[in-house]
Amino acid sequence: MLGVVSRHADEWNMWSLPPEIAARRAELDRACEANGRDPGEIATSTQALFFVLDSNDDADAYIQMVAGRPCVAGTPDRIAESVAAWREAGVDEIIVPDFTLGRGAERTDALDRIIEEAAPAFR
């Protein structure tokens, strides 16, 4: 799949945590070089499940609840650590699926916390 991406794509996306996408991006960069393409021409985006909590005490329980899926759980400060690690891994865009963030005002509040407290680590 990365061979096709390296030849034809403008953007590459995968569900991931920072270490996974960093390793896969390195593979993509090598595939680009093998195909004579500048790896910088391909934007990288990712997504994971997000659970915004008031405390990190239960974060591991949320991560285990969705075992096998990329997941970030905890306070906005803890989420910001992952956001910064994605940035350092070369990610250009993080997609935040909102179906794990509650409903109505709870969802809006969680998104606001991500935007205001965690997203600045990506800039």
Which sequence ranges carry the predicted segments?
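Active-site-adjacent structural elements that line small-molecule/cofactor binding pockets in enzymes
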Residues: 1-123
